Amino acid sequence: FDFILIEGAGGIAVPIYEGTDDFYMTKDLINDCADCVISVLPSKLGAISDAIVHQDYVNQNVSASNFLIMNRYTDSYIEKDNQMTIGKLTNKTVYTFEEHATYENFSEAFLKQLIGVKNELHTTT
């Protein structure tokens, strides 16, 4: 990747700048320059609702593809159930990232998905 933008401003539906007539939102920045989005989800109670609302917003407003990853995953029964349920409801693979893990702990499957990701919107011919 030439550039990596890490969003930490409170979510994908957050205004970055208020113009005269409208807002420039995080989704606008993503649409302007992102090839893919890694959507970081909670793994605890409430994760299903957060994931469904987030993914619905992404599907309606973002042109880049996205990956779902549950953060601070401890492999508890609730987290396993959340992962399975979110996957079924979004029709997406839900990757996990363990609590206190480092970049070396990303799964091979997740890293393979990232390699070569290209958003057709930003590809010129």
Model regions and ranges:
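Secondary-structure boundary/capping motif
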Residues: V14, G46-D50, I78
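Anionic group-transfer/hydrolysis microenvironments
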Residues: A9-G10, K44, Y73
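Histidine-anchored nucleotide/phosphate-binding helix
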Residues: F23-I30, S49-N59
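Inter-motif core of Ras-like GTPase G domains
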Residues: G19-S43
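Structural motif
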Residues: L5-E7, I38-V40, I69
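Switch II (G3) loop of P-loop NTPases
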Residues: F1-D21
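C-terminal lobe/tail of nucleotide-utilizing enzymes
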Residues: I52, D56-T125
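Conserved acidic residues
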Residues: D2-F3, A34-D35, N66
